[in-house]
Amino acid sequence: MSRGASAAHSRASGNPGESSAFAARLTGSPLSRGRADHEISVAGVALIADPTGAVYWPDEALLVVADLHLEKGSAFAARGVLLPPYDTATTLAALARLIARYAPRLVVALGDSFHDRGGPFRMTGADRAEITVLQRGRDWLWIAGNHDPDLPDGIGGRFAGTLALGPLTFRHEPSPDQCDGEIAGHLHPQARIARRGRAVSRRCFASDGKRLVMPAFGAYAGGLNVRDRAIVALFGALSFTAHMLSERRIYAVAAAKCLAD
């Protein structure tokens, strides 16, 4: 995500354990009946949206995650902003659980996998070894992002600007034109709703059935409100759905019912 847009981000809530109360508040809501096996159809392709923010395409055994932002903590530390230096290990552990759950043939990391070009060089040996383990026995594709337009040798996997597979195109930054079948990241969508007298914000998928913008997967990645014009402009109006993440379920909420910041 660009530096300017990052400034508009709220700080990540990050802890999925906080979502249990959110789920309780949404129980029985007319907006959604939360599902663990939440399906989102994009250009006629049935995808499984995981409550962690990943997408699985069963027909292709393909797992997609966006905006890992590995080594964001160490990047901030270098500028004097001290954060616990465990974001890379936390993000990789969450990804390992996903891979164990879905056993994908191909993993696609949808850009901004590293917070900056120096990220791969700041990784601990243990974290680098974990990436090697995760890549074992499957294809792995790093999509170029604005934070990581190229990656050094030795990180494993393949590197590309986009991936076209069947009716779907995977890229980091959403195209400004209406693009059927596009799956992108970059914007870190987050939805905000009012429930029982308080506002609740959660990461979300944003989709109108033609295109899908994925939430950021990284432990320290923030979120941009789905009512922000950068997201609304992609869909032409508020005629899309925010699929809000909870600890174990996803809740579909009409974007028009979401709150602005």
Identify the residue ranges that each predicted region occupies.
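Extended recognition/assembly regions associated with phosphoester-bond processing machinery
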Residues: 2-4, 9-11, 15, 20-261
